[in-house]
Amino acid sequence: MKPIKRILIIRFRQIGDSILAIALCSTLKKSFPDAEIHFVLNKNIAPLYEGHPDIDKVITFDKNENKPFTAYIKKVWQVMHKNRYDVIIDMRSTIRTLFFSLFSLRTPFRIGRIKGYTHFLLNYRTDTYSKNLTTDMVQRNLLLAAPLEKIRPIQYTKEFKLYLTDR
């Protein structure tokens, strides 16, 4: 298998959930130190992640790029064709976020959550919402990295740190 060079993590919406996603970014950076980590977020929360040492690129969507739906699809298509990803981790796994995987079907690892409609586009689906799970949200997010253990052992970390910049 070829080396992992570029990883896309999709985590739109809430500020709290996106902060908890930093542990996944840090885990992936530790496990694949030569890979670029790209993080997709809503524009209004992106400044919290710019300059983070475990995130190489922040990709933002603003209100105008989310609606109308055609503008959203166009932006997703542009992102996916500008960057060739080896791994896509769709932390929300909604019908809207699955377009990232649709426009990148050759990506070897398209990882997300088990939902009734995700088996069409994700080749690795993780049960992070099972009623049997008693783990916290950070641990549930880290479960999304488990399929990458096929490549190498994953160095999990539950730390999530924010870094302040001068801006």
Regions found by a protein language model. Name each.
Residues 1-167:
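Catalytic machinery of carbohydrate-active enzymes
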